[in-house]
Design a protein with these regions (language model features):
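Solvent-exposed, non-transmembrane regions of integral membrane proteins
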Residues: 1-274
Length: 274
């Protein structure tokens, strides 16, 4: 029996290694993962189907060695390592890395392990484990928004001049029309004592509201959308609009993780007092 278990575990490890090689090979030979294809509603549909598949896999885990492996301590350690590496990579180069096959595959693995862990541990003989749920669901929301929310992130560029415009260009070169008008009021270049440019500042009318946009100091017309100053030319300035509709999900996950950490600290403090 032990040999059978060991053989199954080795087979699962080999499958993981082969999957990792396939992901890196896809990145090398195919290029970036086509996130645009999985934009809403495709990502929502696939996300629901994947959760249903994980739930069914958990229900029949006694017959599925792959699910049992994902529920093992080894898979948890691997998921923690993968999550750490992905976080570092995304922190260093968010835009190019988020579309790579290894990062997408790594996030899917972490999300799968986390989902199964939540299904197994959300309650015990004493009832619902609320602290466990708050912390783990918070992490689950953060990982899920990074995985399934990435296709919905949109980056647009707008050439803004004296005449109002609603037309923007996507990263794929497609036209997009904004639900607000943009018009350049004025552009200032603040220089240092030596005469070199020190700060770039654009006054832009967003519909009827005039706002100031500086380099690395964007304006947010609504939650999850920011307008950045990118460049300036004789015909006007170039603005970049970044839309992240899943930002609220990410923020909720982070708040839940912090809340879980606070509850853990308070419980530990009260235990020490007793």
């Amino acid at each position: 029996m032990k040999e059978g278990v060991g053989s199954t575990q080795n087979r699962d490890r080999i499958a993981m290694a082969v999957t990792a090689l396939v992901l890196f090979g896809a990145q090398w030979f195919i290029g970036d993962f086509p996130l645009w294809f999985f934009a809403a509603p495709m990502n929502l549909l696939l996300g629901v189907l994947w959760l249903v598949a994980l739930w069914e896999g958990y229900r029949h885990r006694e017959r599925l060695s792959a699910v049992r492996y994902l529920l093992s301590a080894e898979a948890t350690y691997v998921a923690l390592a993968v999550a750490t590496v992905v976080a570092v990579v995304l922190g260093l180069q968010s835009e190019p890395a988020s579309t790579s096959w290894p990062v997408v595959g790594g996030l899917l693995f972490v999300q799968s392990v986390l989902t199964l862990v939540i299904l197994r541990g959300w309650r015990n003989e004493r009832g619902v484990r609320w602290r466990f749920l708050v912390t783990h669901i918070g992490l689950w929301l953060a990982v899920t928004s990074a995985l399934f929310g990435a296709p919905d992130k949109e980056i647009l560029r707008v050439q803004v001049g004296e005449n109002p415009t609603r037309e923007a260009i996507s990263e794929q070169g497609e036209k997009r029309f904004l639900d607000y008008e943009l018009r350049l009021e004025k552009f200032d270049i603040k220089r240092s004592e030596s005469g070199s440019p020190q700060q770039f500042c654009a006054s832009v009318a967003v519909d009827k509201r005039v706002v100031t946009i500086e380099v690395n100091s964007p304006y947010s017309p609504r939650y999850g959308e920011e307008i950045y100053l990118v460049n300036y030319a004789a015909e006007g300035c170039v603005l970049q609009i970044v839309r992240e509709p899943w930002r609220g999900v990410t923020a909720t996950g982070v708040v839940m993780m912090l809340l879980g950490a606070v509850v853990l600290f308070l419980q530990g403090f009260s235990s020490e007092k007793r």
